[in-house]
């Protein structure tokens, strides 16, 4: 199975399945001397772990305690591969026994079977969101590397269930269960999720990620453009179905005079480019958005087929999120951190004489 590794110089490989013994990541290419311990990684992981307190989140309880098995000595990275893992403690495979022979609508069951001829039906196996543990653990390492260069990355809920934030105050993100920067829409979001949950259905939304302090010059034309890699990173997350940078799709309806970010001695007058021009960072804030689809595991009865192609109906009763938001927010943040850390190292490799 290819496609488990991401990055060029700062490379990460995730491993593990939803109901296997454990999950984790191997990070290769992290420079030596970086301060790193399990507590620091855990702080970021706690934002994505199951049972995090939101009414939109799964009832599955996983501590997801990070264990660093290699690549760190006396609190510093050694430059060798870093392995971070956690054990799966609360997997209940019996919840999937009755539907093991059915293809779940909206899931990768049917496509994994088509590709490999075999699939792990316990919670989606490798296609489960449990895989994102490794992404976030690696993102925590990347975030520390970026911090040393004055770069910070933050993600928040821009929209949930069709209800959109009207103002952005990142100081409010950690103050509510949905990770939303606008407290005035919290009641509406709560009502929306509650109603959908009562029906046994699910909702999607939009996550916005911003990166500040990114220097001009990151990105490798033409096929490794910074925005292309950010788009790939976000699209690689299972629930993400669309990505835009800066003005994004709105730019298609603009005139050139409105779309262009005029340049002044103090910098850019606007940021429709989202901090990236010609695939290279321009020194402005990087802004990306990810469209997150509704969780496909729902209690409402739907039509499907079994593994023999015969018609069947299915209603999924396991412990599932009502929305991937807000748990997916930190996954989006982590993926942008990985891209920026990789491109930062790539830029340093060609500019060390300057």
From Swiss-Prot:
GO terms for biological process: amino acid biosynthetic process; aromatic amino acid family biosynthetic process; chorismate biosynthetic process. Pathway: Metabolic intermediate biosynthesis; chorismate biosynthesis; chorismate from D-erythrose 4-phosphate and phosphoenolpyruvate: step 7/7. FMN binds at residues 126-128, 278, 293-297, 319. Its cofactor is FMNH2. NADP(+) binds at residue 48. InterPro entries: Chorismate_synth, Chorismate_synth_AroC_sf, Chorismate_synthase_CS. One of its GO terms (molecular function) is chorismate synthase activity. Reduced FMN (FMNH(2)). It catalyses: 5-O-(1-carboxyvinyl)-3-phosphoshikimate = chorismate + phosphate. Keywords: Amino-acid biosynthesis, Aromatic amino acid biosynthesis, FAD, Flavoprotein, FMN, Lyase, NADP. Pfam families: Chorismate_synt. Its EC number is 4.2.3.5. GO terms for cellular component: cytosol. Belongs to the chorismate synthase family. Homotetramer. This reaction introduces a second double bond into the aromatic ring system. This is Chorismate synthase. It comes from Desulfosudis oleivorans (strain DSM 6200 / JCM 39069 / Hxd3) (Desulfococcus oleovorans). The gene is aroC.
